[in-house]
Swiss-Prot record:
Induction: By cadmium in roots (at protein level). Its EC number is 3.1.3.12. Keywords: Hydrolase, Stress response. Removes the phosphate from trehalose 6-phosphate to produce free trehalose. Trehalose accumulation in plant may improve abiotic stress tolerance. This is Probable trehalose-phosphate phosphatase J. Belongs to the trehalose phosphatase family.
């Protein structure tokens, strides 16, 4: 058993305090520190470097591969590919990942008699993907729909954003929030959710020891990338994002090299790529899937046979949650995408308006049951 620090707020005062709880399957392991610190896993620098998506070994070849991946993930590239994709191939993908709207009746039949628990990514799921990440606003109609959803089912936002940033967009106190790819988890404000009436609001931060390092790398990345027009470094508290959506494609290789040159000096951080964004995160066994598992346990559904989790997301980082649900054999994932992608999700939706439509239909169905 490993002890973990979990922060809870006092039911009467609302003051945040720290307590220690025993480790369970969802808590393994905590943030990895240098081997001199007791209670942490010792991993050699050489082995850790292998976990980076790009590193010093064979730099030129890996960098070219990285830039190719950057191009492949761009919506423009996907659109050009779609024009050449055969209709048969697209239809085959749709058969494997049918529209959640078209399959709504089947979904409801599977969920009947079970407790639906909803998990939602933010960017590209509740809000459109935009050039400026600070302007990724959700519509008022989407906010009203999510608010109604939270009245019917326990609802969580699971995002790469920091909690403060995503809360400034969503503005709903009755939700659970898992920011920084699940490394910063906070329950609803007490009194706002009927699902946590008798429980303190839980705040779990498995990568807390990495905060000084993340801040240090953030400052270096800001300095390193300031000469690249359009590049934007975002501090998501427990992880960092380097957005290149507004960077000229001719500068992508240069930007990738700059980012790599910083991250390579921190072997306990890993570098990966999302939708026109580099992600820098601590190398710990924690992701959106682990966050989903932790939230289910916090809600009392850890060993429950009649729970039905639904996770909706559009990014590579959401795949960990999709895979977890497949492994549990409970609920399913829904990928938000207009184009065929390799995914562990069971169903698909094309864009945020379709997500809102699906959520609205779930709310209507629940209200009819009551």
């Amino acid at each position: 058993m490993v002890s973990q620090n979990v922060v809870v707020s006092d039911a009467k005062t609302g003051i945040i305090t720290v307590s220690t709880v025993s480790n369970s399957s969802v808590f393994t392991p905590t943030a990895q520190k240098p081997p001199t610190a007791p209670g942490y896993i010792s991993v050699s620098k050489k082995k850790l470097l292998k976990n980076l998506e790009i590193n010093g070994a064979d730099q030129s070849q890996r960098l070219n591969s990285w830039v190719d991946s950057m191009r492949a993930s761009s919506p423009t590239h996907l659109k050009s590919l779609s024009s050449f994709s055969s209709e048969e191939e697209h239809n085959s993908w749709i058969k494997r990942h049918p529209s959640a709207l078209n399959m709504f009746e089947r979904i409801i039949e599977e969920a009947r008699g079970k407790q639906i628990v909803m998990f939602l990514d933010y960017d590209g799921t509740l809000s459109p993907i935009v050039d400026d990440p600070d302007r990724a606003f959700m519509t008022s109609k989407m906010r009203r729909t999510v608010k109604k959803m939270a009245k019917c089912f326990p609802t969580s936002i699971v995002t790469g954003r920091c909690i403060d940033k995503v809360y400034s967009f969503v503005k709903l106190a009755e939700l659970y929030y898992a920011g920084s790819h699940g490394m910063d988890i906070k329950g609803p404000t007490k009194g706002f959710s009927r699902y946590n009436k008798d429980k303190p609001s839980v705040l779990y931060q498995p990568a807390g020891d990495f905060l000084p390092m993340i801040d240090e790398v953030y400052k270096q990345l800001v300095e390193k990338t300031k000469s690249t027009p359009g590049a934007k470094v975002e501090n998501n508290k427990f992880c960092l994002s380097v957005h290149f959506r507004c960077v000229d494609e001719k500068k992508w290789s240069e930007l990738a090299s700059k980012v790599r040159s910083v991250v390579k000096n921190y072997p306990t951080l890993k570098l990966s790529q999302g939708r026109k964004v580099f992600e820098i995160r601590p190398i710990i066994k924690w992701n959106k899937g682990k966050a989903l598992e932790f939230l289910l346990e916090s809600l009392g559904f850890e060993n429950c046979n009649d729970v039905f989790p639904i996770y909706i997301g559009d990014d590579k980082t959401d795949e960990d949650a999709f895979k977890l649900l497949r492994g549990r054999g409970q609920g399913f994932g829904i990928l938000v995408s207009k184009f065929p992608k390799d995914t562990s999700a069971s169903y698909s939706l094309q864009d945020p308006p379709e997500v809102m439509n699906f959520l609205g239909r779930l709310v209507e169905w629940k209200q009819m049951q009551q």
